[in-house]
């Protein structure tokens, strides 16, 4: 065996000179083999043993094996062939698909005698190489295969149930969910942490107050509901995974949830940027009515879409204006007006000028970032205004007030002199 090792090494080096192309699965398998501590000689010896065992199986059961050659010392394409074969078997275990005919062997169930031969084969490998543990590896591979099948079936079952809930009456489902939360004693705050939807939004939706949840968030909520019903307590330790803002896949169906990853991946909305044409339309409607109803918001959204619509081109979901975005813009606009009014009132009061307080804004003007993911870049930046620019703005208002105060004092003195 040692005498054939230089020949095998030369053949392996010839493969490097030919620059073989390996798949990702093959590279992953090779890296995992190397991390186990096996040397090249041990790997080649194990592959030769597997070839011999496969040949014995094919001779015993009358089945032809296409494992890529009978010996690694006489073939010039043994290393890539063995890697391809290992890859094909791995793909068969994880995906349940039959490998390609060019680099596979028969994966059909063997008779009961195969198990006996398998135990003998494992004993042979164990005695020839102390670092290998074929029995343990075989058990792990079978566990991975069964788990992947169960996870996929469970995920498909959850998706079907979510689609069924989407077709049902929303009010009936809300009552079911409220009863479910009460019976399990699950707080809305915990649900908000898991799903990424704000607690206030969940509360308003369950109480049938305010606007309805978007289709994306409703699917996410129903998915959590189904997972929690199937496996109680499994989702409570999960947290929503962060999603890049530039990811355009938020409008697609949510990705499958992995029970082992510890995260509940939900697609979040991308920040919406208003165009100048739409802002002009929004301002005109805002001057008419600052609190439009749902029908009016739909009218405003259609007007904005008509302005930005190009002939022969359909607006994408990222470009289309919806009633929810209109609601968000109006709420931010009202907040901005009241914020500036509060600043001016505070400055006037600091100079002893009594003014009527503009009052606190209503709860309807509060727009939670988690409630409405499509934010307005033209107005939301005011909530995080730079302190320096705010100080300059306040100083300008202060200067104007002082100028008016001096002008009023001069007029009073002039009137007093005229009376004398």
Swiss-Prot record:
Keywords: Chromosome, Cytoplasm, DNA-binding, Homeobox, Isopeptide bond, Nucleus, Phosphoprotein, Telomere, Transcription, Transcription regulation, Ubl conjugation. Its main location: nucleus. Changing residue 325 to E: Abolishes binding to telomeric 5'-TTAGGG-3' motif. Residues 365-377 have a biased composition (Acidic residues). Changing residue 327 to A: Impairs binding to telomeric 5'-TTAGGG-3' motif. Residues 94-132 have a biased composition (Polar residues). InterPro entries: Cro/C1-type_HTH (IPR001387), HD (IPR001356), HMBOX1 (IPR040363), HNF-1_N (IPR006899), HNF-1_POU (IPR044869), HNF_P1 (IPR044866), Homeodomain-like_sf (IPR009057), Lambda_DNA-bd_dom_sf (IPR010982). Residues 18-49 form the HNF-p1 domain. The keyword Hydrolase does not apply. Residues 64-73, 81-93 have a biased composition (Low complexity). Ubiquitous. Detected in pancreas, brain, spleen, placenta, prostate, thymus, liver, heart, bone marrow, skeletal muscle, stomach, uterus, testis, kidney, ovary, colon, lung, cardiac muscle and thyroid gland. There is a cross-link at residue 413 (Glycyl lysine isopeptide (Lys-Gly) (interchain with G-Cter in SUMO1)). Residues 56-139, 353-385 are annotated as: Disordered. Binds directly to 5'-TTAGGG-3' repeats in telomeric DNA. Associates with the telomerase complex at sites of active telomere processing and positively regulates telomere elongation. Important for TERT binding to chromatin, indicating a role in recruitment of the telomerase complex to telomeres. Also plays a role in the alternative lengthening of telomeres (ALT) pathway in telomerase-negative cells where it promotes formation and/or maintenance of ALT-associated promyelocytic leukemia bodies (APBs). Associates with the telomerase holoenzyme complex. Interacts with DKC1, XRCC6 and COIL. The homeobox domain is required for binding to 5'-TTAGGG-3' repeats in telomeres, and for telomere localization. This is Homeobox-containing protein 1. It comes from Homo sapiens.
């Amino acid at each position: 065996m040692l005498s054939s090792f230089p020949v095998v090494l030369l053949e392996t080096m010839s493969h490097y000179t030919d620059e073989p192309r390996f798949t990702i699965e093959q590279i992953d398998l090779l890296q995992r083999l190397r991390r186990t501590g096996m040397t090249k000689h041990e790997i080649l010896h194990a592959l030769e043993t597997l070839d011999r065992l496969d040949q014995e199986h094919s001779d015993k059961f009358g089945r032809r094996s296409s494992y890529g050659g009978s010996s690694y010392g006489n073939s010039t394409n043994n290393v890539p062939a063995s890697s391809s074969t290992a890859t094909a078997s791995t793909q068969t275990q994880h995906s349940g698909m039959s490998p390609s005919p060019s680099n596979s062997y028969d994966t059909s169930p063997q008779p009961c005698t195969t198990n006996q031969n398998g135990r003998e084969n494992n004993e042979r490998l164990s005695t020839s190489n102390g670092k290998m543990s074929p029995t343990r590896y075989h058990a792990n591979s079978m566990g991975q295969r069964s788990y992947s099948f169960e996870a996929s079936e469970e995920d498909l079952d959850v998706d079907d149930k979510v689609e069924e809930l989407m077709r049902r009456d929303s009010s009936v489902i809300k009552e079911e969910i409220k009863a479910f939360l009460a019976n399990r004693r699950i707080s809305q705050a915990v649900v908000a942490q898991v799903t990424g939807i704000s607690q206030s939004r969940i509360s308003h939706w369950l109480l049938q107050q305010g606007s309805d949840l978007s289709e994306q968030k409703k699917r996410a909520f129903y998915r959590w509901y189904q997972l929690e019903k199937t496996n109680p307590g499994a989702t409570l330790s999960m947290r929503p995974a962060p999603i890049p803002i530039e990811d355009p896949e938020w409008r697609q169906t949510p990705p499958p949830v992995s029970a082992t990853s510890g995260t509940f991946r939900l697609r979040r909305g991308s920040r919406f940027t208003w165009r100048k044409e739409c802002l002009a339309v929004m301002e005109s409607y805002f001057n008419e009515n600052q609190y439009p109803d749902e029908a009016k918001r739909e009218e405003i959204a259609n007007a904005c879409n008509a302005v930005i619509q190009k002939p022969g081109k359909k607006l994408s979901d990222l470009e289309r204006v919806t009633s929810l975005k209109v609601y968000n813009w109006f709420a931010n606009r009202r907040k901005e007006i009241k914020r500036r009014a509060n600043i001016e009132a505070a400055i006037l009061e600091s100079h002893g000028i009594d003014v009527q307080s503009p009052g606190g804004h209503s709860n309807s003007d509060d727009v939670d970032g988690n409630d409405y993911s499509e934010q307005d870049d033209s107005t939301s930046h005011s909530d995080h205004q730079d302190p320096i620019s705010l100080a300059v703005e306040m100083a300008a208002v202060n200067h104007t007030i002082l100028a008016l105060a001096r002008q009023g004092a001069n007029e009073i003195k002039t009137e007093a002199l005229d009376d004398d």
